[in-house]
Regions:
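Long, ordered, helix-rich scaffold segments
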Residues: 1-251
């Protein structure tokens, strides 16, 4: 609610690009700065549950499915795809999965793959994790990004963390020689861990299972210890502060 109240007036003022179905926005901005501001406001509004933003994203996805023409403006496709996958049913996830396999555009392929990790359906997230590592349906260079992005999804955090530990030997055998890949994976999967249980699991993994991880695990342990400490000391105070009426930020 805090973020929505902060951005609501400016979001409704800026609106959406008007070349899509049922668009409720203003004329497509011409300056780069204005276009980026519009994109940021749409991202915040959709991420934090603005109902009009959700309706617009769903309308874009529905139009794409029914017409087989993608009229979603390129600069907000990642937001619309992710929002649609998170709100709509399994058929939409399958549609995005199909488009991921049928497109040859590298940048579009990346956006579609990331959108698949936005689902609230843990079955689909688990399916994607398993497909990424045990089949050739996901390019080998994208497997680490899939695991990381599932971990950044609140519904997928524990799934990705569990999957990482269970499949560590396979992951390390495949990517271990590229230390930067291991470091990216470890930091990406652990950066949002913040409970005492997760900290204990990380400590246990560091002591018994993280062979070949190098210096990335000790760094991750420091970060998670900091996360747990912050939550213990400041979480209640932080939520109390968020409940206070916000002072106007945007005109």
């Amino acid at each position: 609610d805090y973020v929505l109240k902060q951005v609501a007036s400016r979001y409704h003022q800026m609106g959406w690009p008007t070349n899509g179905p049922g668009s409720e926005g203003s004329v497509l901005p011409t300056s780069y700065q204005t276009e980026e501001l519009q994109r940021e406001l749409i991202m915040l509004a959709c991420s934090f549950g603005n109902k009009q933003c959700h309706r617009q994203a769903v309308a874009y996805i529905s139009d794409w499915i029914s017409s087989n023409k993608n009229r979603i403006p390129p600069n907000i496709r990642d937001i619309v795809y992710c929002t649609g996958v998170s709100l709509m049913d399994e058929d939409v996830w399958e549609f995005i999965w199909m488009k991921f396999h049928s497109t040859n555009a590298v940048s579009e392929k990346k956006i579609l793959l990331e959108a698949l990790t936005c689902s609230d359906n843990t079955f689909l997230l688990n399916r994607l994790l398993n497909l990424s590592l045990t089949s050739d349906l996901v390019p080998e260079q994208d497997v680490i990004d899939v695991i990381i992005h599932v971990g950044r999804n609140p519904q997928g955090r524990s799934l990705a963390w569990k999957y990482f530990r269970e499949k560590w030997d396979i992951l390390n055998a495949r990517y271990g020689e590229a230390l930067f890949m291991n470091s990216k994976l470890i930091s990406g999967v652990t950066e949002f861990l913040n409970t005492e249980r997760e900290l204990s699991e990380l400590k246990e993994f560091t002591e018994t299972g993280g062979i070949g991880a190098g210096p990335a695990l000790p760094r991750a342990l420091e970060i998670v210890e900091g996360n747990v400490r912050w939550h213990r000391l400041h979480r209640r105070q932080f939520y109390q502060w968020l409940r206070k009426p916000p002072s106007p930020t945007f005109g």
